[in-house]
């Protein structure tokens, strides 16, 4: 985990690498920019192979707190942008599951920026049909299959993360608050992050994710979610 010297000026590499990966016409939501600044100001990142990965909680403390029935840190998510040579391969595998040329429309409208689950699910920025940038979820298929618009604004994405689910890829948890009676594993809230979201954006944290997200899945026969409809079309 990185340590920032007092007064040091450090380039926001996490944000710079995301901007470099954006398709033309896509913008980083201002709230996501603020999040990346908060991550780097707190030193919640590491660097591997020239690529920066950001977190909501210091990973050494999270690992130390992890036991069979509880951990600290709130939602576990990793923010990253893969190196250029791997981006098309990642999307090609997700859409087609085979070595096939990636459709230009996919590259022009989608940019993965986070890993939402340890089983391979991802969050991405997506340009909708009106040219608006939304945050979407791409289920891995081997674990989570949730594929839908996750947040229609950067602020709602931060509010979703602040609720404090273990991982946001598991929509079966979304109908109840974290650490409900049926939960065998306790995830203690990330109070520092929650406080930052509330105070910075003068907002509230929902009780459940269903206040923000209407989950749909890769195998839904008649989807209504605009992102999933698009996925089905471009994956043909």
Stretches found by the model and what they are:
Residues 2-129, 194, 203-236:
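A surface-exposed partner-binding patch
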Residues 7, 21-24, 143-146, 150, ...:
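Generic alpha-helical structural element
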Residues 52, 133, 174-178:
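Solvent-exposed, non-transmembrane amphipathic alpha-helical segments
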Residues 98-101, 145, 181, 189, ...:
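Short, flexible coil/linker segments at or flanking structured domains
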Residues 134-172:
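Compact, glycine/acidic-enriched structural inserts
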Residues 162-209:
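An amphipathic alpha-helical core segment
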């Amino acid at each position: 985990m990185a340590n920032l010297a007092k007064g040091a000026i450090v380039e926001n590499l996490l944000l710079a690498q995301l901007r470099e990966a954006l398709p033309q016409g896509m913008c980083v939501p201002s709230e996501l920019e603020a999040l990346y600044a908060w991550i780097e100001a707190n030193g919640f990142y590491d660097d591997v192979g020239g690529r920066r990965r950001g977190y909501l909680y210091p990973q050494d403390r999270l690992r130390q707190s992890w036991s069979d029935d509880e951990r600290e840190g709130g939602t576990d998510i990793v923010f990253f942008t893969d190196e250029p040579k791997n981006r098309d391969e990642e999307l090609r595998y997700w859409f087609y599951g085979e070595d096939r040329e990636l459709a230009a429309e996919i590259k022009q409208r989608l940019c993965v920026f986070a890993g939402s689950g340890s089983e391979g699910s991802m969050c991405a920025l997506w340009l909708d049909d009106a040219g608006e940038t939304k945050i979407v979820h791409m289920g891995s298929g081997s674990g989570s299959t949730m594929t839908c618009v996750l947040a229609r604004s950067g602020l709602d994405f931060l509010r979703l993360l602040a609720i404090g689910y273990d991982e946001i890829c598991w929509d079966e948890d979304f109908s109840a608050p974290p650490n409900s009676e049926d939960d065998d594993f306790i995830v203690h809230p990330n109070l520092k992050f929650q406080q930052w979201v509330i105070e910075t954006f003068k907002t509230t944290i929902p009780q459940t994710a269903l206040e923000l997200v209407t989950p749909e899945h890769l195998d839904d026969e008649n989807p209504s979610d605009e992102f999933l409809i698009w996925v089905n079309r471009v994956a043909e």
